[in-house]
Swiss-Prot record:
PROSITE patterns referenced in this protein's UniProt entry, alphabetically: DNA_MISMATCH_REPAIR_2 (PS00486)
UniProt GO molecular function: ATP binding; ATP-dependent DNA damage sensor activity; damaged DNA binding; mismatched DNA binding
Keyword line: ATP-binding, DNA damage, DNA repair, DNA-binding, Nucleotide-binding
Protein residues bound to ATP: 610-617
InterPro entries attached to this UniProt entry: DNA_mismatch_repair_MutS (IPR005748), DNA_mismatch_repair_MutS-lik_N (IPR007695), DNA_mismatch_repair_MutS/MSH (IPR017261), DNA_mismatch_repair_MutS_C (IPR000432), DNA_mismatch_repair_MutS_clamp (IPR007861), DNA_mismatch_repair_MutS_core (IPR007696), DNA_mismatch_repair_MutS_N (IPR016151), DNA_mismatch_repair_MutS_sf (IPR036187)
GO annotation (BP), single: mismatch repair
UniProt function note: This protein is involved in the repair of mismatches in DNA. It is possible that it carries out the mismatch recognition step. This protein has a weak ATPase activity.
Record-given protein name: DNA mismatch repair protein MutS
Gene3D superfamilies given in the database record: 1.10.1420.10, DNA repair protein MutS, domain I, MutS, connector domain, P-loop containing nucleotide triphosphate hydrolases
GO terms for cellular component: cytosol
A matching Pfam family: MutS_I
Family indicated by similarity: Belongs to the DNA mismatch repair MutS family.
Organism lineage: Bacteria, Pseudomonadati, Pseudomonadota, Gammaproteobacteria, Thiotrichales
Length: 844
């Protein structure tokens, strides 16, 4: 630590505390403000758009300073946290009246992007995820916590950086911690990440924090169930939370292991390509996700992150969707759900000590809806719905307690009181009555003093600095009674106090202090009572989320005309009248649906040709989106869907330069293609859109053919769109390859797209007609037509087009004469040998 002896005592204190939190902003409490100094002040001024000032000098230099009001700090902190930064809150813990030198201060809380619970800091519809990555021997052990959910999840051991990146980005964490400084420095995730000290990833410390933080039975089970490396990863989260909270994270009550083999895997590029869950209005999530509660919205996002292949789970979801869809019963349920607040996060705030009085009112109002919800669910007497209903706890006793205790519209915090309802506590009511009755006393006292002095302008008042006073103008100085003691002198008046008024003041102020202390005690006792229901409320919240998602699926099924998918073990994917929901939603004319059939018994690879804008990309995407929807338990946009076991969806759709890594569009395309080729299996769905465009025609065609052949050999269900018509010949070479194309019609030099998939290969690409639609000028179009004529008839425009025209899909063999000539070593051959070879070649 640098020498700080030349600084003022207060700045010395600040620098000592700041040295422990060098990488985060320090909010240093001074009176009614949080102040920031030096580099923190400069950074905060820029981030928060607040004034950067200076606080005198220390060590001979001006001290940069910026600050935010204590009462408004939450809004400023929210801005910082949402930018991925962390904050240390340093409060005054000493008594200013007894302190010698600077008031004692301590960091009471650290706020990081993933460890916040206050409503202002959180996205209601998204989990707050903290990921821990433990790197050891080129393996990655990963765990994560949904902070306000009170759970830790273990993920399977990962063996490659690419696999790690896909897993982490799928979770979309707010914050990442790791033991690897190299990983933190590289940050391939582009998320807030920090490398922690080694002890956070000590197996000994991990077991200690597991025992200290978790219920004894849970801790023992975890210690017996998992090996050291997984325990280390769990322990790193618990130790980090303990350090952040400055307390044991008792709200963590569950640790579970995610079974990777039960999920449909989709890498991050494919998620982006398919527009599954990004923030755009055309994403699948924005169309499917119409949940009524934040609880349901977050659960739906978890479904999107981890689609399940467990057919029992899917059958249960489908059964509930059908039941709720009968007579549109979901409408009644959704109406009740719309009145239920985020009780999962509210009870977490109670456990973490960040709950606000209004949260308790919201909790009460939400719990009041549970009897109605349970009655509606009981009307659908199916085992699946009954199971959910049994996990919704009707907490009438807690509702009654909160209703009696908290006023209807409480203040933001308990700090100044005014939260507890009159009649709840007799002692508190008595203390408040002293203050409430003070007005009557002051009116009578003022009237008595006016009579006593004969001064009609005499006033009795109060301010926070000087307390109660009697105010008289200076012109009445000769009428001041002897018992009046001067308290304050103003420009035109004097303020006095009497012994009677002083006694009243002491009594009132004492009652205020006692009432506030009593109210805080009642409030704390109330919170302890509420926390007794923690597990029941968490379980209730989870069940409400589940029924919200499934009611949403039922509503979407009717609104969007979705049908229930079937699942088979016959290696067959049969889809009829499939639609693309986003496009259907955004166009005025009717959407043209298409059928898809892929089967191990017929064909597994479709070569798809046809004009741009003809519907090839839409066709491929809608198949992938349908399978995805089926595996989250939703109904699907098709009149019929029979789906086999698909374990992974891969897509290669579009590309752009990766400038930061120095990679061209073609390099990005080839990297993604290599990943798919190396990982695809017979249980994969592969979407390949126009591969080989970023290089020469010859190279592109060769690569596209080789990739298509590989997918045919693997047996992966593959939709392969291409402009290389030569690839349609593959259907003659491979029995599991077929051709389909999208038709277009020409009429009076215009083109009309049919958007219908038809068996066979396309005969034209209609590129010039599409260019016309795009607005290319007529002179350029005429020139293009002439060029096309030359290419098709003369094939002499350029050397490369000659090569393309002559290019055959079959492998070429070298001429035997050429082989013989290549084998001759002209440096060692004799003239006689040369004549003999020439004679032999001539005979051939």
């Amino acid at each position: 630590m640098q020498d700080i002896s030349n600084h003022t005592p207060m700045i010395q204190q600040y620098l000592k505390i700041k040295s422990q939190y060098q990488d985060i902003l320090l909010f240093y409490r001074m009176g009614d403000f949080y102040e920031l100094f030096f580099d923190d002040a400069k950074k905060a001024a820029e981030l928060l758009d607040i004034t950067l000032t200076a606080r005198g000098k220390s060590n001979g230099e001006s001290i940069p300073m910026a600050g935010v009001p204590y009462h408004a700090a939450e809004a400023y902190i929210a801005k910082i946290v949402k930018k991925g930064l962390s904050i240390a809150i340093c409060e005054q813990t000493g008594d200013p009246n007894t302190s010698k030198g600077p008031v004692e201060r301590q960091v009471t809380r650290i706020i990081t992007p993933a460890t916040v619970s206050e409503e202002a800091f959180l996205d209601n519809n998204q989990d707050s995820i903290l990921v821990s990555i433990f790197e050891k021997n080129n393996k990655y052990y990963l765990a994560y916590t949904s902070y306000t959910q009170g759970k830790i999840y273990l993920v399977k051991t990962l063996t490659s950086l690419n696999e790690l990146k896909n897993t982490v980005l799928k979770l979309s964490p707010q914050e990442i911690i790791t033991n690897s400084r190299e990983l933190a420095q590289q940050n391939p995730f582009k998320k807030p990440i920090k490398a922690l000290e080694e002890w956070y990833y000590s197996n000994f410390e991990a077991k200690k924090y597991i025992n200290d933080s978790l219920d004894t039975n849970i801790a023992n089970n975890i210690l017996n169930l998992y090996k050291n490396d997984k325990l280390t990863t769990i322990g790193s989260i618990l130790s980090y939370l303990t350090n952040i909270l400055k307390d044991t994270p008792r709200h963590i009550t569950d640790i579970s292991y995610e079974q990777e083999q039960d999920t449909l895997n989709i890498d991050i590029n494919s998620r982006i390509n398919l527009e599954l869950d990004n923030n755009s209005k055309s994403s699948l999530l924005s169309i499917i996700g119409k949940c009524k509660t934040s609880l349901g919205s977050r659960l739906l996002k978890r479904y999107f992150s981890n689609p399940t292949r467990n057919l029992n789970i899917l059958a249960t979801r489908h059964s509930i969707i059908n039941s709720l869809g009968e007579n549109q019963h979901f409408l009644k349920i959704q109406d009740v759900l719309s009145y239920i607040s985020d009780i999962e996060r509210i009870i977490s705030r109670v456990a973490l000590g960040t709950v606000k009085p209004k949260d308790l009112v919201a909790l009460r109002d939400s719990l009041e809806q549970l009897p109605i919800l349970k009655k509606l669910l009981s009307e659908k007497n199916t085992p699946e719905i009954t199971n959910i209903n049994n996990r919704i706890h009707q907490l009438d006793e807690l509702v009654t307690l909160l209703d009696k205790a908290i006023i209807e519209n409480p203040p933001t915090t308990i700090r100044d009181g005014g939260v507890i309802k009159e009649g709840f506590d007799k002692e508190l009511d008595e203390l408040k009555s002293i203050k409430d009755n003070s007005y009557d006393f002051l009116i009578k006292f003022e009237e008595l003093q006016k009579q006593k002095t004969g001064i009609s302008t005499l006033k009795v008042g109060y301010n926070r600095v000087h307390g109660y006073y009697i105010e008289l103008s200076k012109q009445h100085a000769d009428k001041i009674p002897t018992e009046y003691v001067r308290r304050q002198t103003l420009k035109a008046s004097e303020r006095y106090i009497t012994e009677e008024l002083k006694n009243f003041e002491d009594k009132v102020l004492s009652s205020k202090e006692k009432a506030l202390a009593r109210e805080k005690l009642i409030y704390d006792t109330l919170l302890k009572k509420v926390i007794e229901y923690y597990k029941q409320i968490q379980e209730t919240a989870a069940s409400i989320a589940e029924i919200d998602v499934l009611a949403n699926f039922a509503e979407r099924a009717i609104k969007l005309k979705l049908s229930q998918p079937k699942f088979n073990n016959l290696a067959k994917l049969e889809l009829k009248e499939v639609r693309h929901l986003a496009i259907e939603h955004n166009i005025d004319e009717p959407f043209i649906p298409n059928d898809t059939l892929l089967s191990k018994d017929t064909n597994t690879l479709q070569i798809i040709t046809g004009p741009n804008m003809g519907g090839k990309s839409t066709y491929m995407r809608q198949v992938a989106q349908l399978i995805f929807l089926a595996y989250i338990g939703s109904f699907v946009p098709a009149s019929y869907a029979d789906i086999c076991d698909i374990d992974t969806i891969y897509t290669r759709i579009g590309a752009s330069d990766d400038i930061s890594s120095g990679r061209s569009t073609f390099m990005v395309e080839m990297t993604e293609t290599a990943y798919i080729l190396n990982n695809a299996s017979a249980k994969s769905l592969v979407i390949m859109d126009e591969i080989g465009r970023g290089t020469s025609t010859f190279d592109g065609l060769a690569l596209a053919k080789a990739c298509a052949e590989k997918f045919a050999q693997i047996g992966a269900f593959t939709l392969f769109a291409t402009h290389y018509f030569e690839l349609t010949e593959l259907a003659k070479q491979y029995p599991n390859v077929c051709n389909i194309h999208f038709e277009a019609k020409e009429y009076k030099d215009n083109i009309y797209f049919m958007h219908k998939a038809v068996t066979g290969a396309a005969k034209k690409s209609y590129g010039i007609q599409v260019a016309k639609l795009a607005g290319i000028s007529q002179d350029v179009l005429e020139s293009a037509k002439q060029n096309l004529y030359n290419l098709e008839k003369k094939q002499q425009l350029t050397e490369s087009t000659q090569v393309q025209a002559q290019f055959q899909l079959e492998p070429t063999t070298q001429n035997p004469l050429q082989q013989k000539l290549d084998a001759i070593d002209i440096n060692t051959i004799t003239p006689l040998e040369a004549l003999n070879i020439l004679f032999e070649l001539k005979k051939r």
